[in-house]
């Protein structure tokens, strides 16, 4: 929005052309979302307390979680609002990728909000019926996959860059799984669906301790922002042997907004948390990360950088599978962070150590750019 305004004003004063610089707009995006989150955080907390939108604690949760009862939830609304406003202000709104990511954010956020509201309003831990949740998240993720396929079909691949529809294998030059070989983009669309929904649910499973999910979200968003910047510049794409994807540069602005909004939320979500993001935040932010990973064609690297999310999801699958097949537990409790709590780790220890793991994994993900 402001990009259009400043470009119009540059006709009267050339100094306004400075807004065209992506790095400047990305920095402003971080600062804007950070400021919105910090300023509106106390207002959101008081409003949620007045509405009695408090967190319910499961009887199966570790004993030390009882003190979290009644802590305001649905704080993800503030995160998404901060990201949305910052993106609309500083991103190039003629870029289709911007609208796809925002669309995914809105739909998954709405599903998460409905899920949270039903749990609070009706004291029903089941939340939104699974069929409705599956339908709307499928509409959003399949819609994103189809849109990306159509855009890719109208964008020729420059010489020396990888195919933007194939699954890139990190650590190897020019090695990929040819999703583009399947007619009509069926393999690509299905894969996109799995990545977006898998990321959304994995982040949601991780969001169980104060600050546990939001900091890895911030770090992974920053890492994906680097890939978005490089994939959107044909010179870097050629040099690094990654796909050149015309529209990804503007995703840096969105990733920056996610970083700023996430840090602002952490201010109030740090232990002891004053607010939780709820499903409205976790489902939407996870889906956004998955969508951006598909756009920059770095799904495997995304799984590496978001290894904490992957471990949390796998721990749940293993626990459920083992209980059904062997009637035995693999972990003391799932997701994984509760297992360590049961082993005697303090909540802050679990969170800090998972943050350290994420830092190392994000660095490893970035190293794949050169280690080939």
Curated annotation (Swiss-Prot):
It holds the Pfam family Glycos_transf_4. InterPro entries: Glycosyl_transferase_4, PNAcMuramoyl-5peptid_Trfase, PNAcMuramoyl-5peptid_Trfase_CS. It is found in: Cell inner membrane. Its cofactor is Mg(2+). It catalyses: UDP-N-acetyl-alpha-D-muramoyl-L-alanyl-gamma-D-glutamyl-meso-2,6-diaminopimeloyl-D-alanyl-D-alanine + di-trans,octa-cis-undecaprenyl phosphate = di-trans,octa-cis-undecaprenyl diphospho-N-acetyl-alpha-D-muramoyl-L-alanyl-D-glutamyl-meso-2,6-diaminopimeloyl-D-alanyl-D-alanine + UMP. GO terms for molecular function: metal ion binding; phospho-N-acetylmuramoyl-pentapeptide-transferase activity; UDP-N-acetylmuramoyl-L-alanyl-D-glutamyl-meso-2,6-diaminopimelyl-D-alanyl-D-alanine:undecaprenyl-phosphate transferase activity. It is a multi-pass membrane protein. GO terms for biological process: cell division; cell wall organization; peptidoglycan biosynthetic process; regulation of cell shape. The chain crosses the membrane at residues 25-45, 73-93, 98-118, 134-154, 176-196, 211-231, 251-271, 275-295, 300-320, 349-369. The keyword RNA-binding does not apply. Pathway: Cell wall biogenesis; peptidoglycan biosynthesis. PROSITE patterns: MRAY_1, MRAY_2. Catalyzes the initial step of the lipid cycle reactions in the biosynthesis of the cell wall peptidoglycan: transfers peptidoglycan precursor phospho-MurNAc-pentapeptide from UDP-MurNAc-pentapeptide onto the lipid carrier undecaprenyl phosphate, yielding undecaprenyl-pyrophosphoryl-MurNAc-pentapeptide, known as lipid I. Belongs to the glycosyltransferase 4 family. MraY subfamily. This is Phospho-N-acetylmuramoyl-pentapeptide-transferase. It comes from Acinetobacter baylyi (strain ATCC 33305 / BD413 / ADP1). The lineage of its organism: Bacteria, Pseudomonadati, Pseudomonadota, Gammaproteobacteria, Moraxellales.
